[in-house]
């Protein structure tokens, strides 16, 4: 298995950046398109555990104003072969002292391209 296949890495890096832009713009249609539309998709958020694409989409519709604005740092994207990638990043939100963390597992589907199959967003405790 090739780690960080150049073409796959370029594709997923672009997809990750497009996801972040859609998140900051609260573009619900685009955000839905980034997730695998399956009951097996999972998203653990800061205050919610969402099982299945429908639950994730419903959460976004009900979220007033969308995601708090943030700045990313320490982003890492690693491809495992040409069809699996893990993206991790830290983020900083305005008026929040805790550092945010996000991890996403992306799979490239033959008919749909890259989709998030699992995501986790959390805020680090001030002390561990």
Predicted regions and their residues:
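Hydrophobic alpha-helical segments typical of transmembrane helices
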Residues: 15, 27-30, 59-60, 73, ...
């Amino acid at each position: 298995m090739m780690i960080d296949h150049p073409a796959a890495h370029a594709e997923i890096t672009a997809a990750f950046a497009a996801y972040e832009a859609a998140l900051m713009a609260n573009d619900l249609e685009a955000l839905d398109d980034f997730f695998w539309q399956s009951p097996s998709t999972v998203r653990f958020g800061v205050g919610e555990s969402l099982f299945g694409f429908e639950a994730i989409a419903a959460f976004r519709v009900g979220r007033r104003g969308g995601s708090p604005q943030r700045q990313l740092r320490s982003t890492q994207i690693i491809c495992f072969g040409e069809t699996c990638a893990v993206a991790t990043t830290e983020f900083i939100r305005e008026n929040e002292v805790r550092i945010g963390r996000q991890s996403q597992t992306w799979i490239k589907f033959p008919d749909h391209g890259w989709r998030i199959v699992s995501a986790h967003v959390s805020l680090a405790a001030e002390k561990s």
